[in-house]
Amino acid sequence: MIIKISQKAFFEIEDAKEYYNLQQNNLGDTFKSDLKNSIENIKNFPNLYPNITNDMKRCILHRFPYSIFYTLKQDIILILSVAHQHRKPFY
């Protein structure tokens, strides 16, 4: 499987990392590590996570209140968004 990250998701990830690093030293790195683990799980088990629409799935991070929204087409996983669950609950 090939992972692609949309520009929107990339900026959301960077914003979250920056925010967490301002809260506590290296917390942003911990966020990114949790995100990478979740992306690896998506890559290894792309159909594990539930559909929220016909073609979009959601994976919830383990340690942070964020969800990864992605689509699966053939051998490409496209990460559309990495959204905070409380700030954007109906994202």
Per-range role (PLM):
Residues 58-60:
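A beta-hairpin/wing motif
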